[in-house]
Structure formats: C-alpha cells, structure tokens
C-alpha cells in the first residue's frame, strides 16, 4: 500500500472508514493507509482519541486529529467517520461520508441503529467496497451504490424465502431444463 502523505495520486483518496457505537467501540473499520494505521493497537488508540473528541462536540463535523482530516456524522447510537489526508479535498471527503450514510440509511430502511447495522453487516461491507477501492474514492452517488449492492431476486438466501417459494423455484428451474433437453 502506498504512503498517502508522501506519494500523492491525482485520484481522490481516503485513509479509512470507521463506524463506532455510542460507547466508542468499533462496529466496523476499514483502513487503507498502512503507514498511519499499521497495527490494530494503533487503530484502536486512534479510534479512542477520535471518539473522545467527537462525542463531546456534536456541532462540528470536521476536525484535524494527529495529522488526519476526520469528517464525521452521528446518529442515534452510531458515529460514521471518513478519514483523509490533510491535503485531501474536504468536499470529496464530505461527499464520501454523505454517500456512505445515505446508502446505509437506504439499505437499513432509515433505521440507522447499531443492531440493524450489525444484522446487515455483509451489505454494509459491500457498500464500503463500492464507495472506495483500496483508498481510492470510486463512487459518491448513494443510489448507484445501493443499486450495485442490492441482491437480485434470484440471489435471495433460503432463510428469506418460504419453503413453498423454494420448492416452486426449484420446480420451475427443473421444468425449464427438462423442456430444453427434450428440444435438443
């Protein structure tokens, strides 16, 4: 991974995305800058410091902490953070944070709370991967991100379907395969 501070790219990039709960505990974190956040211990220490600064000051939504530009947004029991270089354009960091929050809000049906987020963690991870690839901001349109991460009707898990729906789907598929084998 490239050093984000000494090797600038022409692409907009971030150092990490973090979601903490109301107690400052990590719910989800994805760091892209291995020089600033090399170990889990360093990450946790940064998160603790970040939470202590942001939980007291709910009026601001941006701060500079340890040479990292931090944009954040709080909701019922969650804090969403986008971390960037001090040279990074704050408007793009804000667009990334807004995209993350809006996409999560759509997926969770506006129920942006810790329990709902944990229940949909797989989709939330997909959202983060669609927004950012190895630190490079790829998308800032929440609707586009949600569309790309939405499950297709054929990909719905068995737990989300009734037994009759699974049986009907299986029979329909078997029937189509049988028809094609007869036509050959």
Swiss-Prot record:
PANTHER family in the cross-refs: COATOMER SUBUNIT ZETA, ZETA-COAT PROTEIN
Subunit description: Oligomeric complex that consists of at least the alpha, beta, beta', gamma, delta, epsilon and zeta subunits.
InterPro entries for the chain: AP_mu_sigma_su, Clathrin_sm-chain_CS, Coatomer_zeta, Longin-like_dom_sf
Keywords: Cytoplasm, Cytoplasmic vesicle, ER-Golgi transport, Golgi apparatus, Membrane, Protein transport, Transport
A GO BP entry: intra-Golgi vesicle-mediated transport
Organism: Caenorhabditis elegans
Major location category of this protein: cytoplasm
Membrane topology: Peripheral membrane protein
Family note: Belongs to the adaptor complexes small subunit family.
Record-level GO cellular component terms: COPI vesicle coat; Golgi membrane
Keyword Zinc-finger on entry: no
Function: The coatomer is a cytosolic protein complex that binds to dilysine motifs and reversibly associates with Golgi non-clathrin-coated vesicles, which further mediate biosynthetic protein transport from the ER, via the Golgi up to the trans Golgi network. Coatomer complex is required for budding from Golgi membranes, and is essential for the retrograde Golgi-to-ER transport of dilysine-tagged proteins. The zeta subunit may be involved in regulating the coat assembly and, hence, the rate of biosynthetic protein transport due to its association-dissociation properties with the coatomer complex.
Subcellular location per the Swiss-Prot or TrEMBL entry: Cytoplasm; Golgi apparatus membrane; Cytoplasmic vesicle, COPI-coated vesicle membrane
Name by which UniProt lists this protein: Probable coatomer subunit zeta
């Amino acid at each position: 991974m490239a050093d984000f501070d000494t090797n600038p790219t022409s692409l907009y990039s971030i150092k990490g995305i973090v979601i903490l709960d109301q107690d400052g505990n990590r719910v989800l974190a994805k760091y892209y800058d291995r020089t600033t956040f090399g170990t889990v211990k360093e990450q946790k220490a940064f998160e603790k410091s970040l939470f202590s600064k942001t939980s007291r000051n709910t009026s601001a939504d941006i701060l500079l902490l340890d040479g990292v530009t931090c944009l954040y947004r709080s909701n019922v029991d969650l804090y969403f953070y986008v971390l960037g270089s001090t040279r990074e354009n704050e408007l793009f960091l804000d667009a990334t944070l807004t995209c993350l929050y809006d996409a999560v809000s759509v997926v969770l049906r506006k129920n942006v709370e810790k329990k709902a987020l944990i229940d949909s963690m797989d989709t939330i991870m997909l959202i983060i991967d669609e927004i950012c690839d190895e630190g490079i901001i790829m998308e800032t349109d929440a609707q586009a991100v949600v569309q790309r991460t939405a499950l297709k009707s054929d990909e719905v898990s068995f737990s989300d379907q009734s037994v009759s729906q699974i049986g009907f789907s299986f029979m329909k598929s078997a029937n189509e395969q049988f028809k094609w084998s007869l036509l050959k």
